[in-house]
């Protein structure tokens, strides 16, 4: 009879300890140790990632035969963009996001697209019955004989079903519901999630089947389970968006087969998710012209420039400590830029509340939007209207200088394509590229220069 053993494991990094500790020594997180019950058995010689039957031997990398397997085209351009050109056969992809954001809808539509291309897809749900999945598929118009559905949570039965169907793609919804009988802990525990993910990795690498697994997120927005889970998979995709907005953004935070800077944008409708071909037009369609505190910035999301409206509201505070609130941008960046404006431009902002928002529910983390934030703050503080036909681009340093940004030609061309008449850029970006004839480009070297150009003083 196997001997039962108790241990404590960190939910964030997987650190193991014989006793409970308030602070994990591995990742320094507090109150993350949970109790796990395991049975001590003989060690398995099975490897999670194998290259086939027999014993693998070291060989020179120059003698390794490279088999160029074509990627699987999903027929969804936004998803292909995020994945780096399509699904890589034998890859394991983790999809995370808030509850109700549309993860299952996205993957069910992906299954339908591949099934329409005569590719076998196995959709395994541990949260819905087969009839409930059918109801959802009818609403989305997903009907194909090449799409197989299964309601199962037992890892052994799931592996058997994959062998019987022999699909091109497998969807697991979700990894927190799958369990292995050999592990005594409950489904969704650290040990179950780790071992089930390792089993799916082994299946993907040995059979060449692409597997997408859905992962729940914590209150902090991170994928639930040990951080080891994200290290094991090939790609990690986050599906995000505001609950009260119809737009959803798919980002890759890890991708072994492509860039991690790409972004795919979808719009949630009654018939499901629809791709947004030109996100700049969508994010600017509700913009009010001739108002104080509004500025348009050009942010690079991977290889695609996106024009987004930045809004700022500056008002006198009635408390001892002024508030600094930001939605869609880093809160600390706002405090830094306000300090630069106060020190280098002479604005008295220490007794002002500041509220900065990115319209459309988008999150921007690129330094090139610094100048746009500064102009919005100054515009609201002085109550001066900004030019509605103007785009502002530039990074701000602590000394008040406007620093060079990358891919300035793509940003300016996108602004010209959408009908903007003027763009403010760093003066160091003025040479080495062709300026469109339909737009005026003005170079500035400091924040003071930028405010004189945009606000007149």
From Swiss-Prot:
Motif (RadA KNRFG motif): 254-258
Protein name, per record: DNA repair protein RadA
Cited function: DNA-dependent ATPase involved in processing of recombination intermediates, plays a role in repairing DNA breaks. Stimulates the branch migration of RecA-mediated strand transfer reactions, allowing the 3' invading strand to extend heteroduplex DNA faster. Binds ssDNA in the presence of ADP but not other nucleotides, has ATPase activity that is stimulated by ssDNA and various branched DNA structures, but inhibited by SSB. Does not have RecA's homology-searching function.
Keywords on record: ATP-binding, DNA damage, DNA repair, DNA-binding, Hydrolase, Metal-binding, Nucleotide-binding, Stress response, Zinc, Zinc-finger
The record's note on its domains: Has a putative N-terminal zinc-finger, a middle region with homology to RecA with ATPase motifs including the RadA KNRFG motif, while the C-terminus is homologous to Lon protease.
Organism: Halalkalibacterium halodurans (strain ATCC BAA-125 / DSM 18197 / FERM 7344 / JCM 9153 / C-125)
Class of this enzyme: hydrolase
Protein family (similarity comment): Belongs to the RecA family. RadA subfamily.
GO MF entry, a single one: zinc ion binding
GO cellular component, one term: cytosol
Gene it is expressed from: radA
Positions of region (Lon-protease-like): 353-457
């Amino acid at each position: 009879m196997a001997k039962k053993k108790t241990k404590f494991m960190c939910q964030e990094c997987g650190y193991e300890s014989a006793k409970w500790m308030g602070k994990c020594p591995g990742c320094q997180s507090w109150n993350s140790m949970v109790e796990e019950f395991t049975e001590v058995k003989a060690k398995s010689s099975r490897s999670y990632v194998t290259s086939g039957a027999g014993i693998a031997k070291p060989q020179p990398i120059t003698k390794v035969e490279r088999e160029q397997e074509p990627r699987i085209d999903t027929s969804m351009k936004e998803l292909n963009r995020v994945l780096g050109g399509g699904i890589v056969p034998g890859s394991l992809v983790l999809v995370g996001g808030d509850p109700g954001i549309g993860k299952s809808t996205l993957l069910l539509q992906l299954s339908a697209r591949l099934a329409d291309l005569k590719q076998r897809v196995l959709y395994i749900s541990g949260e819905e019955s087969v009839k409930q999945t059918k109801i959802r598929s009818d609403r989305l118009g997903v009907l194909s004989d090449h799409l197989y559905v299964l309601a199962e949570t037992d890892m052994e039965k799931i592996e058997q079903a994959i062998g019987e169907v022999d699909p091109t793609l497998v969807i697991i919804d979700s990894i927190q519901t799958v369990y292995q009988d050999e592990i005594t802990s409950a489904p969704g525990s650290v040990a179950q999630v780790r071992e089930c993910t390792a089993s799916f990795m082994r299946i993907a690498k040995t059979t060449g089947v692409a597997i997408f697994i859905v992962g729940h997120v914590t209150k902090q927005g991170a994928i639930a389970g040990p951080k080891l889970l994200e290290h094991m998979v090939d790609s990690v995709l986050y599906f995000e968006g505001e609950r009260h907005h119809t737009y959803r953004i798919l980002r890759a935070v890890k991708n072994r087969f492509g860039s991690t800077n790409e972004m795919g944008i979808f719009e949630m409708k009654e018939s499901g998710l629809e791709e947004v071909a030109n996100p700049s037009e969508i994010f600017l369609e509700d913009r009010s012209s001739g108002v104080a505190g509004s500025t348009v910035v050009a942010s690079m999301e991977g290889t695609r420039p996106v024009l987004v409206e930045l809004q700022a509201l500056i008002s006198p505070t009635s408390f001892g400590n002024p508030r600094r609130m930001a939605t869609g941008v880093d809160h600390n960046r706002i405090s830094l830029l306000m300090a630069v404006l106060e020190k280098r431009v002479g604005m008295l902002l220490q007794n002002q509340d500041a509220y900065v928002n990115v319209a459309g529910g988008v999150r921007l983390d690129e330094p090139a939007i610094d100048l746009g934030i500064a102009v919005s703050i100054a515009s609201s503080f002085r109550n001066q209207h900004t030019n509605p036909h103007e785009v502002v681009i530039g990074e701000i340093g602590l000394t008040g200088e406007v620093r060079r940004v990358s891919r300035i030609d793509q940003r300016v061309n996108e602004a010209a394509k959408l009908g903007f008449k003027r763009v403010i850029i760093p003066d160091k970006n003025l040479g080495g590229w062709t300026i469109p004839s339909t737009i005026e480009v003005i170079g500035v070297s400091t924040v003071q220069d930028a405010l004189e150009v945009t606000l007149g003083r």
